[in-house]
Every structure is written in structure tokens, then in C-alpha cells.
Amino acid sequence: MGELSMQEMPLPALFEQGSKIHASAESSVDQDTVRKGCEILRQCEEMIGKLGLFSVNETKEDISTANLKYILVPYYLAELTEKVADNDRIKVLKASQAKLKEFISFCETMELVPEEEIETSTQGGANSSVDRRAKKIARFKRQRAAESKLLEIKERKERRGRSTKAAALSSPVETEEDDVLDDDGEEEREAWLTTISLGLCKAFDLLEMLKKEEEILSAVKEKQLQDGEREFSQAILDERTKKVETWHRDAAARAHHTKPAAPITCATFAQDVIEGRAKVSQAHEHKHQPLIFGPASLVGRNPTTEREKIAAQVFQPHYRLPTMSIEEAGLTEMNMMNEWQERNVKLMEEANSSWYKDTPKSRPGEDDEEDDDDAAQDKARAWDDWKDDNPRGAGNKKLTPCG
């Protein structure tokens, strides 16, 4: 069998392949491999968005252990994007910084960023060299602690695996696996949370480094433009403007004839896609847009800013939201009724068919039973006739004195 294409691969397989490319890119930089890894991780991001695995209303405790690893996708994509060789280095740096900021912002929403990092970001960064040095030392300590913890979890898992294998070989009795599975689940969650913490430490350092590199390159480019070594001609600008206008016209023309696909509303469909039992089409898009029951619904307008969206989500229903509309429920019941009527019509046709109207043939033993009944009736009639001819006591009349 041939290999599955990137669109047909399930999300766990895509993430595993992308993480392997990310790990191998740390030692050797092959541009084809790096670009392939970026493409795979972008496909992961697109599938995560369509499946709606994460919500801004959740924290790290609300995310399942199986989905924790997908938080690292923007971080892996940022590191691979930074390694892409391109003539426009500033464009690569901006793309990598955007993914790093997206990763840090989402981790902050999930309450995964340390308090000291949040305080530093709210204050606009450390001003003095002493503050910057203290921040780097604290970050380095967290990074070393996370690396040591990951190594400890790995060694503990290997030891437990060896002991379990030895116990299975020495004892023929099957051991209980519930405790082992619980330990594995707790260790897996702890390992992914530690990996995310390690990724945050590296992401902050990489973001600072990329900002400095962008500042240097921007200064060099500005100096080159001022010196006249490299200028954009008016023809190039006109050509780019023409391309943009053409693209917008084509997009507007497609929008009139393109019907957007219905969003994925079934909660189990996302899990089916994750485990590879179903495929998600390119047209589907699933976003967390819950029904609004808060202030925005009272004033009769849709929320536009993030503040209005959060305020609109204050008053939420205490009951479970419906999974289908009234029209869909009516169609389902109508289909059930049609099937029931078709089944009844079929049964009535079978009941009125000639096979049921024909008189059933007598069985082989019924003729013998009828003959036995006639013989018994003849015998009973003969006995009655004899009793009429010979009344009771008629044979003893000669023995009586008056006889």
C-alpha cells in the first residue's frame, strides 16, 4: 500500500511526523526537510482549528491529556520557520515571531506561563541590565529543571517497563493493568506539561533574539535604501498593485458563486477525525462560537471586540444545548414514519396474497383421526340400541316369586 497523502493523514500521525522533523532540524538543517516540516505543521494547525480542540474559555485542567501536545504546534512551526533560508530574511523573522507570540499568548490563556514572565511582559520588559540578567537566570533555572524532570520521567518509565516485562515473564498469572495505565496517563500528562514549560523558556529567548536580529537587518536595509544601493522602481510597485487588485477581483467573483460548507456540529466527529476513522474536507471549518445568552443578546447586536464576547458569555444556560434543529428533528421523525408505513403496507400485501387465501391442506394424520371418531360414534349408537332392547334387570324376572 502506498503512503497516505498529507490531507488523508490523521492528526496524531501528522503531529508525530512534524515533531520528528523538528527534533532532527536541531542537529542538521536540510532546507527540503525544513520546508516539508513547516507544511506538515501548518496542516496540523489547520486541522486543529477545524476540529475546535481548544477554546479561550478553557484552562490547562480542562484540556485532555491526548490533546496537550497540540499546544506545541505553533512553537515547533516558529522554530522551523526561523531555519528557512530566504532572500527576504526580515519576512522570515516576522513570520517566526508571529508564531512565537501566538504560542506564548495561548499558553498565557491556558495559565501555563509563569507569573514572573507575565509581570515582565505587562511592564514592557526589563529596563536595566540587572533586571534582564535576573530574568535570564530565572528562565535558565526553569529550563534546566524542566530538562531534568523530563529525563527523570523517561528513566522512571523505562524502569517500570523493564520491571513489568520481568514480572510477566516470571509469573504466568496475569497482573492488574489498571494501576499501570493510570501511572502512564499521569506520567504522560506531566511529561507534556513539562515539555510545554521547556518550550516557553526557549520561546522567550528565541523571541528576544529574533527581535534583535530584525532591528539590525532593518537598520541595514534602511541605510542601503538611503544610499541608493537598492531601490524599488515604480514599475515593480505598479505590478504588485495590479496583482493585488486582480486577486481581490477574483476573490469577490468566487464569493458570489461559492456556498460555504456547514460547520461541524457533532461532538464525536472531531474525535473520529483525530483517531483516523473519518476525514475532514477542506471546506469545513469549525470555530468556538457558542450561542449568546448574555448582554449582547439583550441589546440585539453581535459582539465585535474581545471584551464584548467575554461579557456575552457571562450568562450561559444551565441545560445542554440542542444537537439538531426543529426542522432536522421533524425530518428524522418523518423518515421514521415513512419507513413504518412502508413496512405495514408490505405486511398487508403479504397477508392478502393468494398464499394466505388458499385453504390449507390436511395433514397426513388427520384422516386417521376422523375414521377413529366415526367408529367410536357407531359403537356408542350400537350400545345405546342394545340398552333400549335390554332394559336393566330384564334377565332376572324369572327368579322373582311373582315371575
UniProtKB/Swiss-Prot annotation:
**Sequence ranges of Basic and acidic residues compositional bias:** 376-391
Annotated disulfide bonds: none
Q: What happens when the gene is disrupted?
A: RNAi plants show severe growth retardation, the formation of spontaneous disease-like nectrotic lesions leading to premature cell death. The defective plants also display a strong reduction in protein synthesis, and chromatin bridge formation at anaphase.
First and last residue of the signal peptide: none
Q: State a GO cellular component annotated for this protein.
A: cytosol
Q: Which InterPro entries match?
A: TAP42/TAP46-like_sf, TAP46-like
Q: Out of the domains of life, which is the source? A: Eukaryota
Query: Where do Acidic residues bias regions lie?
Result: 174-184, 366-375
Alphabetical GO biological process terms: regulation of dephosphorylation; regulation of signal transduction
Q: Name one GO molecular function term.
A: protein phosphatase 2A binding
By its UniProt entry, which Pfam families does this protein fall under?
TAP42 (PF04177)
Q: Where is this region: Disordered?
A: 158-184, 351-403
- Assigned protein family: Belongs to the IGBP1/TAP42 family.
Q: What does this protein do?
A: Involved in the regulation of the TOR signaling pathway. Seems to act as a regulator of PP2A catalytic activity.
Entry protein name? PP2A regulatory subunit TAP46
- The organism encoding this protein is Nicotiana tabacum (Common tobacco)
Gene that codes for this? TAP46
